[in-house]
């Protein structure tokens, strides 16, 4: 619904506009600076400006609206239109009639239950369940106060009950088949038990003992077979690169190197043989094995008198 808003001057006002007749859109506030005068006047993004200082905005361009706002001095009067906020509700069709579904937004009161209020509201005897397996019996006690649950006796009883379920029962409870002493099986077991037995040995020790016994007659006592150590021949470092030597000064080159016709030189030695001009970033020429610049190379390659220099191009 339309409403009037007055912002006290002077500028800045603290909001940003968009739209206008040149954009075929109404003038709309798109941004509000927090803590500004527009925020204090409760302006919101999305508000449509209908008039500025009494002038309607339906025929204003974006630039005209900005000029009208800048012209405001001690105060700025805006007439805005703000859309009403509506709560969405689903449409329910019942017997061919569409009506909105009723929604109750009231909170339901809940009963306040402090901690411990639900423990033993009604006194009941604590009776152990019948037919409990003896192997899985766990002793636990319950009282009105949980302090007694952590006593030493209760902890020991609970631990004992849990261990009884984990540890298997003793073999003495199981019935064993009795063998009469006059039977042949009893005498055989009794004789084998009385005979002296040799100490048990592991499989690897028995194999080692057999190897020692088999070779005892072939070799003298106190000797053993030992393989001669084999020296591994390591090949030379084929991947290592030899240090290049400078073609001019003859010393080794470490670092940057200049290569020309399979010859290496220091960057400072890559100069003309006549004028010592550095040829690193220039053209160079080899004449009779020496390195020259273009000027001295042409001087050394002049044809004899009576001959002319002719440029030959390779055939296509």
Curated annotation (Swiss-Prot):
The PDZ domain covers 1-84
Q: Which domain of life is it from?
A: Eukaryota
What GO annotations for molecular function exist for this entry? actin binding; metal ion binding; muscle alpha-actinin binding
Give every LIM zinc-binding domain span.
Answer: 244-303
Print the keywords alphabetically.
Answer: Cytoplasm, LIM domain, Metal-binding, Methylation, Phosphoprotein, Zinc
Which Gene Ontology cellular component terms are annotated? adherens junction; filamentous actin; stress fiber; Z disc
Pfam families with a match to the protein in the record = DUF4749 (PF15936), LIM (PF00412), PDZ (PF00595)
Would I find Flavoprotein among this entry's keywords?
no
Q: Does the keyword Zinc apply?
A: yes
- Name the GO terms of the biological process aspect: actin cytoskeleton organization; heart development; muscle structure development
Where can this protein be found?
Answer: Cytoplasm, Myofibril, Sarcomere, Z line
Name where it mostly resides: cytoplasm
Sites where Phosphoserine occurs are at 18
Q: Which SUPFAM superfamilies match?
A: Glucocorticoid receptor-like (DNA-binding domain), PDZ domain-like
CDD domains in the cross-refs: LIM_ALP, PDZ_PDLIM-like
* Listed InterPro entries: PDLI1-4/Zasp-like_mid, PDZ, PDZ-LIM_domain, PDZ_sf, Zasp-like_motif, Znf_LIM
Indicate where the modification Omega-N-methylarginine is found in the sequence.
164
- Assembly behavior: Interacts with ACTN2. Forms a heterodimer with PDLIM4 (via LIM domain).
What function does this protein fulfil? May play a role in the organization of actin filament arrays within muscle cells.
Q: Which PANTHER family match?
A: PDZ AND LIM DOMAIN PROTEIN 3, PDZ AND LIM DOMAIN PROTEIN ZASP
Q: What is the protein named?
A: PDZ and LIM domain protein 3
Q: What is the lineage of its organism?
A: Eukaryota, Metazoa, Chordata, Craniata, Vertebrata
């Amino acid at each position: 619904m339309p409403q009037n808003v007055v912002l006290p001057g002077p500028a800045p006002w603290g909001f940003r506009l968009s739209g206008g007749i040149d954009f075929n859109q109404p003038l709309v506030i798109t941004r509000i600076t927090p803590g500004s005068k527009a925020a204090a006047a409760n302006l919101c993004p999305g508000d449509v400006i209908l008039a500025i200082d009494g002038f309607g905005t339906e025929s204003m361009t974006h630039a005209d609206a900005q000029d009208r706002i800048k012209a405001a001095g001690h105060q700025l009067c805006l007439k805005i239109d703000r859309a009403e906020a509506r709560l969405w509700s689903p449409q329910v069709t019942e017997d061919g009639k569409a009506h909105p579904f009723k929604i109750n937004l009231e909170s339901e009161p809940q009963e306040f239950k402090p901690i411990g209020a639900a423990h033993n509201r009604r006194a009941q005897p604590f009776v152990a369940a019948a037919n409990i397996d003896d192997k899985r019996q766990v002793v636990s006690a319950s009282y009105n106060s949980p302090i007694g649950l952590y006593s030493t006796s209760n902890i020991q009883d609970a631990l004992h009950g849990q261990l009884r379920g984990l540890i298997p029962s003793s073999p003495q409870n199981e019935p064993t088949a009795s063998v009469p002493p006059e039977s042949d099986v009893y005498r055989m077991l009794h004789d084998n038990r009385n005979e002296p037995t040799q100490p048990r040995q592991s499989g690897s020790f028995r194999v080692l003992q057999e190897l020692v016994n088999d070779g005892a007659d072939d070799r003298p006592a106190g000797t053993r077979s030992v393989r001669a150590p084999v020296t591994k021949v390591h090949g030379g470092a084929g991947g290592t690169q030899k240090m290049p030597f400078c073609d001019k000064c003859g010393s080794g080159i470490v670092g940057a190197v200049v290569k020309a016709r399979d010859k290496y030189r220091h960057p400072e030695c890559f100069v003309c043989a006549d004028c010592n001009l550095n040829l690193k970033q220039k053209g160079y020429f080899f004449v009779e094995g020496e390195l020259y610049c273009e000027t001295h190379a042409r001087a050394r390659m002049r044809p004899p008198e009576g001959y002319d220099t002719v440029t030959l191009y390779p055939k296509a």
